[in-house]
From Swiss-Prot:
Lineage: Bacteria, Pseudomonadati, Pseudomonadota, Gammaproteobacteria, Chromatiales
Chain segments carrying region Disordered: 1-22
GO cellular component: cytosolic large ribosomal subunit
Gene3D superfamilies, A to Z: Ribosomal protein L28/L24 (2.30.170.40)
Signal peptide: none
Protein name from the UniProt record: Large ribosomal subunit protein bL28
Keyword Iron-sulfur applies: no
Length: 78
């Protein structure tokens, strides 16, 4: 499964580990993703999303119904 937030679209980025001697090796910065069940009152069911912490805050602010309608408009199956 890909490490992408379904709400924000956040995905891993790349960068460097830098040692004390200033040696650089490649690394990945992974988003803070969680599988989370949200209760959708209008559909009387739970929806399981893979969301980042920022995505959860967006759902708290906008509401799960608005976020789900945005996801469905993008063509994601929810």
């Amino acid at each position: 499964m890909s490490k992408v937030c379904q709400v924000t679209g956040k995905r891993p980025t790349t960068g460097n580990n830098v040692s004390h001697a200033n040696n650089k090796t490649k690394r990945r910065f992974l988003p803070n993703l969680h599988h989370h069940r949200f209760w959708v009152e209008s559909e009387q069911r739970f929806v399981r999303l893979r969301v980042s912490s920022k995505g959860m805050r967006i759902i708290d602010r906008k509401g799960i119904d608005q976020v789900l309608s945005d996801l469905r408009a993008r063509g994601e199956k929810v």
